Amino acid sequence: MLAATCNKIGSPSPSPSSLSDSSSSFGKGFHPWKRSSSSSSASCNVVGSSLSSFGVSGASRNGGSSSAAAAAAAAAAAAAALVSDSFSCGGSPGSSAFSLTSSSAAAAAAAAAAAASSSPFANDYSVFQAPGVSGGSGGGGGGGGGGSSAHSQDGSHQPVFISKVHTSVDGLQGIYPRVGMAHPYESWFKPSHPGLGAAGEVGSAGASSWWDVGAGWIDVQNPNSAAALPGSLHPAAGGLQTSLHSPLGGYNSDYSGLSHSAFSSGASSHLLSPAGQHLMDGFKPVLPGSYPDSAPSPLAGAGGSMLSAGPSAPLGGSPRSSARRYSGRATCDCPNCQEAERLGPAGASLRRKGLHSCHIPGCGKVYGKTSHLKAHLRWHTGERPFVCNWLFCGKRFTRSDELQRHLRTHTGEKRFACPVCNKRFMRSDHLSKHVKTHSGGGGGGGSAGSGSGGKKGSDTDSEHSAAGSPPCHSPELLQPPEPGHRNGLE
């Protein structure tokens, strides 16, 4: 469309018919032209400027389509060209100036019409071409006034256009607050508090930086900084650093009173050390009451272990303390311990003896250690938790010492040696029998018999777990068994 318009503008001699058509439509109030130097120059100047401005403003203010605007621009350009060619205006310098400026005015009119059809600023700025046309025609004889008006229009319209563009950009920035078009160095982050106003700048007065709070985010060095801490860290106090980097922003307004007492190093000493003392004091009355006599060993010198401390009273303790100690449950389930527990303080004599009897009817075995009584009860029940891990053996025993004795049969170790003849034995009871042969008059036969019998007895004891046998590391009876008691068990 613009190319067609330019072709029409560049035609050297338009047809007179177009002049008649255009003159009939545009020149209703014009009088017949006369060939005068000054008047024709001035009138040509007026006609050229009025035609160009009329064509553009009419196309823009009527709000027509782009084709109508282009047609109007083409008609105005043709009329201006015909006027300049038909009325040559003599040889005056104004005629050459008009003939040059008329074509430039037509081109400017066409460009302005094309811009007005698509620009949102057409209604306000329909005279974009006026400064160029008037300035060019100012070179003529009567174009001085046009030149002055061009300067005034140039000084008025161009700042208005720039301000219009800036206001539209500001409106876009209001819609999209993070697009810094008008102000590229303005911060994107706006204060969220409604009463801040323009206080949301990064360098707001009175607000310290977030890294200047202190060594720790709770640590406050002095009361002045503690008093300034809520104001400098509250989100409404100012700016970018409070909305992004403040870890205490939402809490200092509520807990500002704690900055002097709980968060200060001097005042927080009463929270740590006395609290620790109070907590430790809470355990002090419990420990002596629960374990009043835990320091001395009650069976030291009696040949017992710690397990027998249950039924026996402490040497330095009162009957009341011992009753409180054993009030929870009986340490042993044997009949003697149950009777001592039932009697309470009166059963202190039974506890002092430390006797643990088997509750199986008809057995009557008594042991000085609860571990020995438990091993004996396993012998009654048939429980054998100790298993030999020797290859292809897998024998099971009721006591751990029996298992160790059995392992020596696999290894062939003889730990016990006779001090007289240096003979070695696997079991201590065999050695004791052998020593008796040296002290008595039994001779070697008895020793050999005891040795062979000891060997056989070792196997049978390991197999049957006889509780009355007196080997080393095995539970010993308080009363030695009768000579035929072992054989009866076997």
UniProtKB/Swiss-Prot annotation:
Pfam families per UniProt: zf-C2H2
Disordered: annotated segments: 1-47, 136-156, 294-324, 431-490
Compartments it resides in: Nucleus
Compositionally biased residues, Gly residues: 136-148, 439-455
Main location: nucleus
Keywords, in A-Z order: DNA-binding, Metal-binding, Nucleus, Repeat, Transcription, Transcription regulation, Zinc, Zinc-finger
GO cellular component, one term: nucleus
CDD domains: SP8_N (cd22538)
Bias kind Low complexity: ranges: 16-25, 36-47, 297-314
Zinc fingers (C2H2-type), renumbered ranges: 314-338, 344-368, 374-396
GO molecular function terms attached to this record: DNA-binding transcription factor activity, RNA polymerase II-specific; RNA polymerase II cis-regulatory region sequence-specific DNA binding; sequence-specific double-stranded DNA binding; zinc ion binding
InterPro entries: Znf_C2H2_sf, Znf_C2H2_type
Biological role: Transcription factor which plays a key role in limb development. Positively regulates FGF8 expression in the apical ectodermal ridge (AER) and contributes to limb outgrowth in embryos.
Family: Belongs to the Sp1 C2H2-type zinc-finger protein family.
Protein known as: Transcription factor Sp8
Lineage: Eukaryota, Metazoa, Chordata, Craniata, Vertebrata
Gene field: SP8
